């Protein structure tokens, strides 16, 4: 029984070592694409921001305190 446990532990250790070697490549995430829409003075209108960005070929827009940012390219 004891040899069976030692053998099982050995197999788990070997499997873990092999998996660790295969996953040496660093994980990289693609950068989010954000494009500034036309500069608007004053407050940003969310509906207008979305509409302008969709017309330009993006998924939508996000209003910030200063301007509208288009997010996600459809192409």
Swiss-Prot record:
A GO BP annotation: defense response to bacterium
Which residues are the propeptide, according to the record? 21-32
Domain of life, per UniProt, equals Eukaryota
Annotated signal sequence range: 1-20
Asked if the keyword tRNA processing belongs to this entry, the reply reads no
Gene Ontology cellular-component annotations: extracellular region
Report the locations given in the UniProt record.
Secreted
Instruction: List UniProt keywords, sorted A-Z.
Output: Antibiotic, Antimicrobial, Cleavage on pair of basic residues, Defensin, Disulfide bond, Immunity, Innate immunity, Secreted, Signal
Q: Major place of localization? A: secreted
* Annotated disulfide bonds: 44-63, 49-68, 53-70
The record's similarity note reads:
Belongs to the invertebrate defensin family.
Query: What does this protein's UniProt record list under function?
Result: Has antibacterial activity.
Protein's UniProt name: Defense protein 6
